[in-house]
Amino acid sequence: MLELRLVQGSLLKKVLEAIRELVTDANFDCSGTGFSLQAMDSSHVALVALLLRSEGFEHYRCDRNLSMGMNLNNMAKMLRCAGNDDIITIKADDGSDTVTFMFESPNQDKIADFEMKLMDIDSEHLGIPDSEYQAIVRMPSSEFSRICKDLSSIGDTVIISVTKEGVKFSTAGDIGTANIVCRQNKTVDKPEDATIIEMQEPVSLTFALRYMNSFTKASPLSEQVTISLSSELPVVVEYKIAEMGYIRFYLAPKIEEDEEMKS
């Protein structure tokens, strides 16, 4: 038996909006410690990892480990029927091929339940090792989102370079080039407005902007984003989910065919 009750139901809606563009079908894994998902995008270029810890739910019951295969677009359609202030309960019986979503309005004068068929999805769990990164950038998620959007109007790729001076986002396209530099800025009134750079050594990597733009759909979940970079590793773009967990996106760097862009 599985029963999860989430008071801030809007959080689950935001999670779905953050990942459904990348991933169509995925297994949600429930265990005693939390509700998680790990899935590759259809082209096997990006990986998304989600964790919602059990203690973040008002009520969390998971009698045994359970994997529920869901179509994320269908799940998003159901969650759109919930009000932003609704309490969301997810229920599934052992061995059942359906999952039930229950939406309660805060004053409990309206309760709706939606049942959705589960799917059999073959998925392999990739062990993601904890790594040391050459550079870690923390910055306002809205700023990162704006940069990716602005650069997309010029080019298809972004070069992210971290030096002592700051973090530079660059692109080049048919109409010209663009460079945006964010300097370290810790002396802000609000911690969420800070840009903090921890650098062991300078690093410069190239990524596809369409993926970066897709990752920024998680911005409503967190006011800060953490970007971890190392020359031999995929970038990790992480959005912390307050008190509960995180969404992490992993993307392999592009091997730059066009050397002119580097010069």
UniProtKB/Swiss-Prot annotation:
DNA-binding region extent: 61-80
Keyword DNA-binding appears in the UniProt entry: yes
Organism, as annotated: Oryza sativa subsp. japonica (Rice)
Subcellular location per the Swiss-Prot or TrEMBL entry: Nucleus
Function: This protein is an auxiliary protein of DNA polymerase delta and is involved in the control of eukaryotic DNA replication by increasing the polymerase's processibility during elongation of the leading strand.
Name the record gives this protein: Proliferating cell nuclear antigen
Keyword DNA-binding attributed: yes
Main location: nucleus
Gene Ontology annotations for the cellular component aspect, listed alphabetically: nucleus; PCNA complex
Molecular function (Gene Ontology), one example: chromatin binding
GO biological process: cellular response to UV; leading strand elongation; mismatch repair; positive regulation of DNA repair; positive regulation of DNA replication; protein homotrimerization; translesion synthesis
NCBIfam families named among the record's database cross-references: pcna
Pfam family, one: PCNA_C
Domain of life assignment: Eukaryota
Keywords for this protein: DNA replication, DNA-binding, Nucleus
Family of this protein: Belongs to the PCNA family.
Subunit structure: Homotrimer. Interacts with FEN1A. Interacts with POLL. Interacts with RAD/GEN1. Interacts with DJA7 and DJA8.
Stored InterPro entries: DNA_clamp_sf, Pr_cel_nuc_antig, Pr_cel_nuc_antig_C, Pr_cel_nuc_antig_CS, Pr_cel_nuc_antig_N
